[in-house]
């Protein structure tokens, strides 16, 4: 759990430093210490994932599944599963859980990476090559995934 909690602590620190921009979150983390951030990360990663979203469009989710599992070779987009895991559970400390993520939130984050608003060299490069239709498909698939 320690490594998994580090991902959330890292994101909270990014909000506090201004590296990640969101006025609501920046206000919430302004007075947090690094130890507070670690504790919050540990708390959230101790929670069992709930089925928070569902895929609403089976055809779109099917296209998204192909992208998630195999990528898009002609656009040099790797499979999401390579980093985030086949079941979307994430990989401790480095890659967040994607399974069951709300499509609207996930799409906003992919677009933020594509525009450079959110900084992560790997995700910036990948999303810059994605078409919006690819993003819509993959977030639809992720919504229907259930992390184990």
Put a short name on every predicted segment:
Residues 30-52, 63, 104, 109, ...:
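C-terminal capping alpha-helices of c-type cytochrome domains
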Residues 9-10, 69-81, 93-108:
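Sequence context surrounding c-type heme c attachment/ligation sites in exported
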Residues 5-61, 65-66:
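Extracytoplasmic c-type cytochrome modules immediately beyond a signal peptide or single-pass transmembrane anchor
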Residues 57-89:
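Sequence/structural segment immediately N-terminal to covalent heme-attachment motifs in c-type
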């Amino acid at each position: 759990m320690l490594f998994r909690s580090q991902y959330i602590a890292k994101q909270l620190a990014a909000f506090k430093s201004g590296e990640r921009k969101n006025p609501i979150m920046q206000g919430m983390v302004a007075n947090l210490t690094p130890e507070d951030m670690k504790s919050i990360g540990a708390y959230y990663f101790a929670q069992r994932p709930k089925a928070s979203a569902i895929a609403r469009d089976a055809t779109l989710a099917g296209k998204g599944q192909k992208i998630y599992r195999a990528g898009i070779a002609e656009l040099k987009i790797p499979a999401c599963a390579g980093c985030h895991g086949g079941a979307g559970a994430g990989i401790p400390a480095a890659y967040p859980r994607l399974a069951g993520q709300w499509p609207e939130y996930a799409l906003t984050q992919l677009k933020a990476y594509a525009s450079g608003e959110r900084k992560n060299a790997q995700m910036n490069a990948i999303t810059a090559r994605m078409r919006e239709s690819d993003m819509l498909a993959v977030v639809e698939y992720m919504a229907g995934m259930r992390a184990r």
